[in-house]
Structures are given as C-alpha cells and as structure tokens.
C-alpha cells in the first residue's frame, strides 16, 4: 500500500492511500475523521503489516530462499529475483510519517525518497513527479506547483481541496508504483544492502533523535544574546564616530558611499548598484583601516545574534529542548545534515561564538561524545 500524509506545521490535513495502482483514495481530516483517528488507523495498519511479516518469516522454509550472512531471511529468491510477497507501507518520506504514526519496524516500510537518493545522490531534490518520470517508464504526473501553485497546504485546504486531494493521491501512487523498479535498481547497482541494513534503520534512529531533542540552558542563551547586543551597540557607535555621521551599517549602498567616497578608502570596486562591500573586499582593507575591522566584527556579531541567540531561542520547545530535523537525502557524500535549526554550523572561532555551544547540555548522568573520522573519504579511497 502507498501512503502519503498531508501535513504542515505539525497539523495533519488528510492522507492519500493507494491500495494498488488502480485504487487510490484521499481521506480528508473533516467531520468524524479527526487527526487522531486517521493517524491511529494508519498506525494500526503499520502494526498489522509488521505482525504479518513476522508470521511469514516464522513460517518461511529457509530452503526456498537465498541465505544472506547478514540477515536471517533474505529478500531475494534463489534465482536472484526480489521477493514481493512481503507486505509493506510505501511512502515518499517515511520519517515524515513517523512524526505522526508510531512504528519501530524498518521492514514494514519502503521509503521511495531514500531509495531514489541512493540511486542518484547528486540530485538536489526527489519529488514524486521526477520519480515517476525516471522509474515508471517516463510517466508524466502533474507537479505540486501545477496542482497547488505556490499555496501553502493550509491555503490549499481552504481554496483548492481537489488539487490537494490529487496531490496526496499522486504521492501515494508514486511511492507504491516505484517500489518494484527501485528495489530492482538497488540490487542492480549493489545498493540493496546499503538500503536495507543502513539507510532504512537510520530513518527510525533519526526520527528518535528528532523527537528526543537536545537540552538547552535558555537563561544562558538569553544572557548570551544580551552580551551580543551590548557589544553590537558599542561597535555601532565606534563605526559612526569614525565615519563622522550616522548611517545604516546594514546597507551595503550607504556603507560603500561612506567608505570609498567620503573616507576615500582605496580598493573600492563599483558595480551598477554601488560599491561592493563583500567580505573578501573588506578583509583586504581591515589591516589598514580600523573602521573596516569594526564593520566586519559588527557583521559577525549581528549574524550570531539573529541566527543563534535569537534564532535558537525561538525554537526551544515547551519541554526546554530543541528538536532539529536531520536529513539523510541532501548531501552527495551521505553525510547527515541538520536543519530547522542547523546545529552543525555553530561557530567556534570567536569567543562569543564558542559561548553558544555551552548552552547545549547533556542529560543528567550523561556526557557529550565528540567523535570524528579524520579525512575518512581520502582514507577509504586510498584503501
């Protein structure tokens, strides 16, 4: 069965269900169908799939299947073809489902998005219409933009109910229909074990990490923001004093006029919109001109304040933790990335930047472990 859950900002609007490639339905959350009821029924479905697969494995005659040293029962027949009697729920993004539906069985699901990523990790996005074109014999399906335009899900729910239903159904259909060709492609490219043994279980691990979150000392974060505000105010006055007038330091156009016309700094590059005040230009001038050094520090601190001090404070949940999103299908190298917020690029070079890391704390009785493979890609290639 193919499943798509239509969600936005934690709210569930409906679900697309593809029983097969001909029977596809949309169930909106309305009337007696509440979010809890719909998600509960989908959770029951996943549980039944898990139970069914467990029973089949127990009854399976191991002489009829090809043994895999890493698994008790293989998904491959003795002739090398894939078995499709194993039931599963197919989705474009299983982790998105797990935010609303509980399950701990990787073998009960098929994630078309992760499969598409393994087959072509260089793509920037994996949409259902792209998958259909590539894995369903060039089939053309209307893209999200064609069905909903630029509307949010909530806006589409209010104004384009038919388009929203079609979108949900196309996603469910694509996830189901792509299962066989994608699995065959994973086998052909030698990626089947990577998918089943690494990427599929990782979905559930990342989901658990997101739900658990990381503890933050909110008061220290607030204090950090106040320290930044004080220093930013000091720099602002210093810059205005050196410039001889007040101006908008965040305006490249105004800054360019001040630096390269009024103060006559050398090295200015004029464009159609004014002088360039890009970091690489200013960094060359900083050793000679104190005002430029102050401007660079001002930029760094205002970014720290908006992105980290204020930005992180705004995403602390009621449980006092930050629940980031971890992505496994974005980087071409397979590295996990973090968004909403990004916890992987918190600065460490500046003293004020290092302070931000101290607001993250482990659970009582635990410590943070910092582990890294040194130059792992080069070492693997050399091996």
Give each language-model segment a name.
Residues 1-134, 229, 382:
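Conserved RNase H-like, two-metal-ion catalytic cores of nucleic-acid enzymes
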Residues 1-32, 80-88, 92, 147-354, ...:
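Conserved "right-hand" nucleotidyltransferase catalytic core of DNA-directed polymerases
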Residues 42-43, 357-359:
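A generic local secondary-structure boundary/capping motif
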Residues 54-55, 62, 70, 144, ...:
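Intrinsically disordered, low-complexity regions
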Residues 105, 139-140, 247, 267:
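Secondary-structure boundary/capping signal
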Residues 107-108, 349, 359-362, 383:
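Short, surface-exposed loop/turn microsegments at beta-strand edges and helix-strand junctions
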Residues 112-173:
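Short alpha-helix plus adjacent loop in nuclease-associated cores
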